[in-house]
């Protein structure tokens, strides 16, 4: 009898350990690679939150193909660390794919590692041309691009801002300023091309390091050139610096059009003051003051964000990453497994029509694995809030002008 009990106990122990082992195998690991410290940490962390919320949602629904998604985090504080963290996540942690990364420079560096290793990399926030322009096999981008941002900036000027000011856009002088990384350089180049193609006059195109502490000479140059429209592609610190120093110098262009980054952040408005930023335009990812009939699921996303993080979303970066991750998870759930070629096949078959995501745009990968349905929107700061004013089907407010 004692022997039987021992055998039963041993068998039960083996069964339990087998169950635990099987459960451990039922986790699928993905890398979450964003700058969560350093100068890009604020928007890096905001972007990562979108991925985290998508993971929470898919796990609550039973995971992907019955497996729980586990995020393994890496900090892409600079390009070298982004590369090192990609190696660690792939070689030591054994992630099946990497999601990230917000910064164009960081993803360009890190994705070289994943490409050589044959591990899929899903970029959900960086806009530079070079991200997908290298023709990598395992890199996919779900979000809109620098070209989208530039085109929307110029279109908004021609179709909305100039008429609202009672001006012929061809009579207006445009100054283009930008932080000089891959992000700013790409957007500014497309802005210049789009403006010139439309017959507009660009009087200045000038880059600067994003960590600059003085933009007074650039403000002076814009003023001397007579720029009455300024397009700035920038992070938070340089957005704040330009707005403050332009104000101090008494330089008041007819319109300022931001290119996402710092111009989409509530902390930027709070830092410079709501009166100063009032009327400033912005071309960027879908934000939250938008016609929700064009963005199904956005309200639920905001509620989930507030429940998890205890505040309103700080910018549309979290939403864009959430939408991208959800789309990839949907594809993987319909796919055959988590081997690299199975993942690639699954996401290439993805076909989400426009108007069916919380960002408004659809998802279908085309040339160079870029989401060919991704688009941006036009916003304006009004009464301390960033509200959507363009295009018409997504707008909740009319453009305002200080004539």
Swiss-Prot record:
Superkingdom assignment: Bacteria
Alphabetized SUPFAM superfamilies for the sequence: Periplasmic binding protein-like I
Gene3D superfamilies found in the cross-reference section: 3.40.50.2300
Classification via Pfam families: Peripla_BP_6
InterPro entries registered for this protein in UniProt: BCAA_transport, Leu-bd, Leu_Ile_Val-bd, Peripla_BP_I
Signal sequence residues: 1-26
GO biological process, one term: amino acid transport
Keywords: Amino-acid transport, Signal, Transport
UniProt family annotation: Belongs to the leucine-binding protein family.
Function: Component of an amino-acid transport system.
This protein's name: Leu/Ile/Val-binding protein homolog 8
Source species of the chain: Brucella abortus (strain 2308)
């Amino acid at each position: 009898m004692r022997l039987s009990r021992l055998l039963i106990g041993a068998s039960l122990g083996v069964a339990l350990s087998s169950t635990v082992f099987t459960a451990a195998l039922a986790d699928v690991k993905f890398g979450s690679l964003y700058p969560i410290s350093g100068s890009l940490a604020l928007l890096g962390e905001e972007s990562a939150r979108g991925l985290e919320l998508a993971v929470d949602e898919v796990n609550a629904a039973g995971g992907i193909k019955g497996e729980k998604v586990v995020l393994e985090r890496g900090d892409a504080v600079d390009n070298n660390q982004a590369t090192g963290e990609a190696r660690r996540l792939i070689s030591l942690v054994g992630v099946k794919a990497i999601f990230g990364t917000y910064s164009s420079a960081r993803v360009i560096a890190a994705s070289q590692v994943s490409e050589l290793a044959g591990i899929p990399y899903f970029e959900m926030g960086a806009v530079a041309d070079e991200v997908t322009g290298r023709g990598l096999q395992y890199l996919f981008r779900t979000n809109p691009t620098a070209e989208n941002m530039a085109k929307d900036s110029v279109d908004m000027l021609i179709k909305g801002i100039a008429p609202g000011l009672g001006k012929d856009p061809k009579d207006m002088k445009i100054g283009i300023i930008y932080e000089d990384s891959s992000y700013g350089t790409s957007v500014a180049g497309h802005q210049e091309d789009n403006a010139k193609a439309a017959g507009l006059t660009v009087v200045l195109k000038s880059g600067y390091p994003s960590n600059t502490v003085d933009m007074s000479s650039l403000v002076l140059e814009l003023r001397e050139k007579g720029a009455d429209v300024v397009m700035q592609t920038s992070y938070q610190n340089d957005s704040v610096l330009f707005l403050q120093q332009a104000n101090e110098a008494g330089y008041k262009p007819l319109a300022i059009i931001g290119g996402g980054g710092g111009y989409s952040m509530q902390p930027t408005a709070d830092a410079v003051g709501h009166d100063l930023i009032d009327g400033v335009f912005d071309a960027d990812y879908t934000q939250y003051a938008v016609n929700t009939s064009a963005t199904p699921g956005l309200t639920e996303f905001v509620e989930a964000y507030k429940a998890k993080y205890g505040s309103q979303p700080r910018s549309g970066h979290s939403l864009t990453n959430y939408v991208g991750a959800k789309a990839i998870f949907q594809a993987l759930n319909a796919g055959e497994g988590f081997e690299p070629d199975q993942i690639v096949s699954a996401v290439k078959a993805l076909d989400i029509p426009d108007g069916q995501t919380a960002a408004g745009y659809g998802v279908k990968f085309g040339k160079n694995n870029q989401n060919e349905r991704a688009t941006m929107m036009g916003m304006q700061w009004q009464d301390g809030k960033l509200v959507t004013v363009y295009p018409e089907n997504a707008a909740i407010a009319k453009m305002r002008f200080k004539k």
